[in-house]
């Protein structure tokens, strides 16, 4: 029986062509005959009996191939669910190398499982992508991007580190270092309480440093959001938070991460910079105005997302909570002021309905009274930040205004933002 190729790094080439997946030794159904000898490539061979050598792959080859016999004890073959998600049980083996311990999360792409790596003797996070063509293709793009980032991020301090990847039962599986919770999950479990300003400063600097690093490599992440920023450690401390007047204060406690170290994840939507990119990118709350208006986008769309994230860390809530384009644009004007007329004159034909007589068609274009209320309740950016920040508010407001400039050509770059006085206190 021919076994499939399992990949370890470094890679010298990636073939994106679709192919029929060879059946794995651990995919054999219970009634099958004894495991047969076959070719097995990569470091998974450490879990194959009759292994000839324990040497690691050389730098000159993408994998190491030896003959081996697959072990028994693989989980029974299960059909995927109707959406193409992999069906598993805790304690299952995911290839002979990885043992499933828990489910860490899920999304439209698939699931993330906490697994024990028998070879490295450590816990890892394994992203199991849905067995659907478009998600498999996106996973291969993510792997390529992770490889490129890994080549240049020698210290591994900016982006999540990929350990391995393989194709198992029609699911692309990407093995990552195990990190802590996402910023979103931390906020949610903390009842959406804001972060202290010094922590916002540290996280903001790291995030901008990662974005600047990617932009230097001509990469655009396109999906920056709190869900895609992980704390390296989930450890936290509780600090008192005082509410009410000085005479009668109620004390409650909120969680604060012990460490400010973060890493960016999810590079499935990452693309290289090129002309005329007009398709929709980014998750709604963090989507830049040029994307909504069909004006084309580039590096500045990431910078806009960072600005929204920094405000959210200061307040505990997403800045623009909407799911409709015109309402979203109206919220932007409410918080940041009117759009430049030259931007509104250039909108594409799909976005013309949002503009009337050179201005945003609001409030006339509002679809409901609730929509009007949602926009009117938003304060100006300065007032919003000052409600939550005691010191450094002026510097923070100035920097965020630069990150959230409507015109992408006038928006500050990530590298410029790193030199802003707001970050002087950390240097």
Swiss-Prot record:
Keywords: ATP-binding, Kinase, Nucleotide-binding, Serine/threonine-protein kinase, Transferase. It comes from the Eukaryota. The keyword Chaperone does not apply. The active site is at 223 (proton acceptor). InterPro entries: CLK_kinases, Kinase-like_dom_sf, Prot_kinase_dom, Ser/Thr_kinase_AS. CDD domains: PKc_CLK (cd14134). GO terms for biological process: mRNA processing; protein autophosphorylation. GO terms for molecular function: ATP binding; protein kinase activity; protein serine kinase activity; protein serine/threonine kinase activity; protein serine/threonine/tyrosine kinase activity; protein tyrosine kinase activity. It is an enzyme of class 2 (transferase). The keyword ATP-binding applies. It catalyses: L-seryl-[protein] + ATP = O-phospho-L-seryl-[protein] + ADP + H(+); L-threonyl-[protein] + ATP = O-phospho-L-threonyl-[protein] + ADP + H(+); L-tyrosyl-[protein] + ATP = O-phospho-L-tyrosyl-[protein] + ADP + H(+). It holds the Pfam family Pkinase. Its EC number is 2.7.12.1. Belongs to the protein kinase superfamily. CMGC Ser/Thr protein kinase family. Lammer subfamily. This is Serine/threonine-protein kinase AFC2. The lineage of its organism: Eukaryota, Viridiplantae, Streptophyta, Embryophyta, Tracheophyta. The gene is AFC2.
């Amino acid at each position: 029986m021919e076994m499939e190729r399992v990949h370890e790094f470094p890679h010298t080439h990636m073939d994106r062509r679709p192919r029929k997946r060879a059946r794995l030794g651990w995919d054999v159904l219970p009634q099958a005959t004894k495991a047969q000898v076959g070719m097995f490539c990569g470091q998974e061979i450490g879990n194959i009996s009759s292994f000839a050598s324990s040497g690691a792959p050389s730098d000159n080859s993408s994998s190491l191939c030896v003959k081996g016999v697959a072990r028994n004890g693989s989980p029974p073959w299960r059909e995927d669910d109707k959406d193409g998600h992999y069906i598993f049980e805790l304690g299952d083996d995911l290839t002979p190398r990885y043992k499933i311990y828990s489910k860490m999360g899920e999304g439209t792409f698939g699931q993330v499982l906490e697994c024990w790596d028998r070879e490295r003797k450590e816990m890892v996070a394994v992203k199991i992508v849905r067995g659907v063509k478009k998600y498999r293709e996106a996973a291969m793009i993510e792997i390529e991007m992770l490889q490129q980032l890994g080549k240049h991020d020698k210290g591994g301090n900016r982006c999540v580190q990929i350990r391995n990847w393989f194709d198992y039962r029609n699911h692309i599986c990407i093995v990552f270092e195990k990190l802590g919770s996402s910023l979103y999950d931390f906020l949610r479990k903390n009842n959406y309480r804001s972060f202290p300003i010094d922590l916002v400063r540290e996280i903001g600097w790291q995030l901008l440093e990662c974005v600047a690093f990617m932009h230097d490599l001509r990469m655009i992440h396109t999906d920056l959001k709190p869900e895609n920023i992980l704390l390296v450690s989930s450890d936290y401390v509780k600090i008192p938070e005082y509410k009410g007047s000085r005479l009668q204060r109620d004390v409650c406690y909120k969680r604060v991460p012990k460490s400010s170290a973060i890493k960016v994840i999810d590079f499935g939507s990452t693309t290289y910079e090129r002309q005329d990119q007009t398709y929709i990118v980014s998750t709604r709350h963090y989507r830049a105005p040029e994307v909504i208006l069909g004006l084309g986008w580039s590096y500045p769309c990431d910078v806009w997302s960072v600005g929204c994230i920094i405000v959210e860390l200061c307040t505990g809530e997403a800045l623009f909570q909407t799911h409709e384009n015109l309402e979203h644009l109206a919220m932007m004007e409410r918080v940041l002021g009117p759009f430049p007329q030259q931007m509104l004159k250039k909108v594409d034909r799909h976005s013309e309905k949002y503009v009337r007589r050179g201005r945003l068609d609001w409030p006339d274009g509002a679809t409901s009274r609730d929509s009007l209320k949602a926009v009117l309740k938003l304060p100006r950016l300065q007032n919003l930040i000052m409600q939550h920040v005691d010191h450094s508010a002026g510097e923070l407001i100035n920097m965020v205004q630069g990150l959230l400039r409507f015109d992408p050509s006038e928006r500050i770059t990530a590298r410029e933002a790193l030199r802003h006085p707001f970050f002087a206190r950390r240097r």
